């Protein structure tokens, strides 16, 4: 299972929100580039960036920080937040971003998502942020009437490379991921699902492994990495490539 450290950008700084509330933000580092370098050095194979200002404004805001992070790293970076038209998507991909994450337009303009999936195959991921099973939009400030599972199935048909599922009520709470919601969502899809929100300890990651056979093949970790409740290297050893579960047994000769 892939471990994706998260960097949330607000005002050019690395922050974390509590349950998506912009009024409950905590600055963890003034320099997001330095944070990104640290996660790469500790073994991350992909980085997850969210432009919180962009999600609120409806267009990317922290472009300088994003460009600097992409330039500083050798691992791929995926970015979401405020991507609601083709030009903004292409702008980020031209910067060297590996994958872009679409959220609001998946609800408001699904045809555009289909066009982007066709133009940029494998590079379009849809982020589904759910509040009580309904999809939230516009930086989590609004809640639609669309069911998360219904939207995910439609996005798969349109060509999305993966679905990132966030349970807003778990995000930043350190209460553990919503396994039931993830199980239900993944069972309806054939494309990969990436879990996000609530992971607070290695045991949460081990619990997610039970969903890997359904297609939950990645997990985004934010606050727990910044508080030190989870060490990235430990998480990778537990559920990433080369985890102890995957090591073949030693073939000792039989005695006698």
Curated annotation (Swiss-Prot):
UniProt key word Amino-acid biosynthesis: yes
Q: Which UniProt keywords apply?
A: Amino-acid biosynthesis, Cytoplasm, Histidine biosynthesis, Isomerase
Q: What is this protein called?
A: 1-(5-phosphoribosyl)-5-[(5-phosphoribosylamino)methylideneamino] imidazole-4-carboxamide isomerase
Q: Which gene encodes it?
A: hisA
Q: Which InterPro entries match?
A: Aldolase_TIM, His_biosynth, HisA_bact_arch, Isoase_HisA-like, Isoase_HisA-like_bact, RibuloseP-bd_barrel
Enzyme Commission code(s) on record: 5.3.1.16
Q: Which GO terms describe its cellular component?
A: cytoplasm
For biological process, the GO terms are:
L-histidine biosynthetic process
Q: Which GO terms describe its molecular function?
A: 1-(5-phosphoribosyl)-5-[(5-phosphoribosylamino)methylideneamino]imidazole-4-carboxamide isomerase activity
Catalytic site: 8, 129
Q: Top enzyme class of this protein?
A: isomerase
Q: Which reaction does it catalyse?
A: 1-(5-phospho-beta-D-ribosyl)-5-[(5-phospho-beta-D-ribosylamino)methylideneamino]imidazole-4-carboxamide = 5-[(5-phospho-1-deoxy-D-ribulos-1-ylimino)methylamino]-1-(5-phospho-beta-D-ribosyl)imidazole-4-carboxamide
Organism, scientific name? Synechocystis sp. (strain ATCC 27184 / PCC 6803 / Kazusa)
Where is it localised? Answer: Cytoplasm
Which family, according to the similarity comment? Answer: Belongs to the HisA/HisF family.
Q: Where are the transmembrane segments?
A: none
User: This protein's superkingdom?
Assistant: Bacteria
Q: Pathway membership of this protein?
A: Amino-acid biosynthesis; L-histidine biosynthesis; L-histidine from 5-phospho-alpha-D-ribose 1-diphosphate: step 4/9
Where is it mainly found?
cytoplasm
